[in-house]
Amino acid sequence: VMEVMQRAGLAEKLARLLEADRQFSEANEIYNSLIEQDPDNPDIWIRMVEGQIRAGKGQKALDYALNGPATYGYKLTAATLFLDARMYPEAEALLDGLKSDPNAPDEVHFYLAAIAYEYHKDVQETLNFLESIPPENRFYDRALRLRIQLLHDQQRYEDAMQLILQGQSQFPTERDFRLMEIHLYLLQDRYKEALTAATAAQQIWPSDDEIAYVYGSVLDSLGRKREALAVMESIVARNPEDYQALNYVGYSLAEQGKDLERAVLLLEAALKQAPDHAYI
């Protein structure tokens, strides 16, 4: 048995060398012989799928994906290979056979959402697939964020806000959902609501520089320049490399005609941290 395993290992190494040399047909012959010896080995089947994808033979890769081990793990791994190669029709053909299976993993719907968005350009279908992913699934957090982004892009702001608040409730330690709320209010020029949200976020994460910057920006938008400057100064004191706060304080001092030497130093420091930023 050990001798057989060693021969199989050597054969697989040879096949990989042939693939590296783009001799895909020769490599595939070796994989086929290995499958005859071990027909349920998912690793060999995946190598065959991968080899055909690299050879640009999508249909043959799909045939291997469909005829390989009848396990969810194998099918999803093969689907991932198709998605990575942007072979969306092949990925969809493989996943379509799983989406009506009540026992199939919820990841199937996440992958189908990717196809709906990237290949079909169908936002509503994408949302439908994402909505079917339950909270206990490991992809739920990502699915929720994508739903918010899609609704935002469609200017469905109230729907997006409902999901943002849902995210805050389900993930209270995730600051991103707080930042999303603030930015969505700012996008709609709802500055008072933005300030309320930013103040709440500041109370939860008092030392978070990004939240502090957004809080200061909201104050600035409301015309409360002195308070905004104080917030930005506190960020610079805490983090002298925060280019956004450096930039704000530098320009504020320059506009006021105060401490111009320091203003120049702050702006130079901001430029050093973000040399390609358009507003420095």
What positions do the PLM features span?
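Alpha-solenoid helical repeat scaffolds
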Residues: V1-I280
